[in-house]
Amino acid sequence: MSHVKHSGRRRGFTLIEALVVVAILSTLLALVVPSAVEWIRVQRVKASADELVTDLQFARSEATRRNLEVAVTFRTVAAQTCYTIHTRNAFGSCKCELGNGNACSFGIADNRFELKTVSLPTSNAVSLTSSLSSSIYSPASAFVVGMNALQVAIDGGDDRKLRVQTNATGRPSICAPTGSTIKGYTTCP
């Protein structure tokens, strides 16, 4: 019979050591998770503002490129806030709540008016509130028709707020309203 000789040193972790590691990791997670959730919420607001600025610039350029008036129409319905970029038409305003590809169909098989529709479901915890129901860009100058400045409040709950605004020429920019906790933007006038 052979005997295996054990050295005096054991390998592995004891139950106490494993519990200490679990306790330390739990404490670290409790500190990190709330800040990670907050970071995600702030990123949603920033991404919504950035996308809206890009879409307003797109609407301006499409008005010039197509030599047609291009509108950005905002709507709020129970389950979402949304907007549609579309060419002006004789059928009326587009309804972004009908979804991408259907917002400007007006019962016509050829949906040639809709350029883009963006929806923000309320479950996303970000909402848009526009000072105008529509902002229309002129093909001749890419300025806003009527020189009406647009302000869109982007609200992510609590103090996570940004504002996208256009000047009289239609150029969009992002600012942080007073009291916003989102850093890196100028304060809105």
Predicted regions and their residues:
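N-terminal helix-rich module
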Residues: 2-9, 27-53, 57, 61, ...
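N-terminal signal-anchor/signal peptide hydrophobic helix marking the start
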Residues: 11-23
